[in-house]
Amino acid sequence: YEDTDALHPLGTPGYASYGGTSMAAPHVSGAMTVLMSRYQDMNAIQVRDILFTTARHTNTDGSLFTGWTAEDGVPDVLYGWGTPDLDKGMFGPSQLLGKFEYKVNNLDVWSNDISQKALDARKVEDQAWMKATTNGTDTSAVYELGEAYTGMKNIENAVISKEDAEKWRHEYYKKRAEAIQNKIDNGLYDGSLVKNGDGTLVLTGNNTFRGGVTLNEGSLYGFNDSFGITETAAGK
């Protein structure tokens, strides 16, 4: 408790209900810790991707979160990926967000269906941005710059000049365009799986990622529909 009144002096133990990002952070961190104990052969970024892609955006009755507007499998502008779903997170990722290089030292089974919906959505967004900015060279969009700063006092250079804003936008556009072009040139808009390590990975889901599967070490097992979609006549 905060030291707000005589009944609740500072340091008195008790329970209370809080909301917002301050309380969301420890819950997400706790979920991440549980998943890291489940996937001990993965690095933190890989476990984070499982946390993201297996999150849910529905209430206990199956209804969507209030205000949820994104398509299934795509982060929402308000909620992001949603709420961690540890039950689903136990069974592998639900999407590949790029090249997933997994060094398996033991046995792991992924039974979730694995797609690349978020990657597909990002590709559409990036293509639209490249077109709107002429591949990052057109920085003439409106600059919403104020003439005065009304926040904290004694802040130097609080008002950004048009010249600085143009310079920063040009640098940002250039870097973003280069990053997008690199994804295009190297096929990074398709999720792929690379199996390393002496262990065994078993895939049992109906998987629709399009970047393929590479087995470098150990063993890899799965159904016909578990290795993603490739550009063959049969789609396998």
Give a label for each model feature.
Residues 1-33, 37:
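Extracellular S/T/G-rich loop segment that most often corresponds to the catalytic His/Ser-adjacent loop
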Residues 14, 37-157, 173:
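C-terminal subdomain of the subtilisin-like protease fold in secreted/lumenal serine endopeptidases
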Residues 20-22, 31, 51, 80, ...:
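Residue-level detector of buried hydrophobic side-chain packing
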Residues 81-84, 189-194:
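Signature of short aromatic-glycine-proline-rich micro-motifs recurring in repeat-based ectodomains
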Residues 106, 111, 118, 128, ...:
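Residues on the solvent-exposed faces and adjacent turns
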Residues 160-191, 198:
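Intrinsically disordered, low-complexity acidic Ser/Thr-rich regulatory segments
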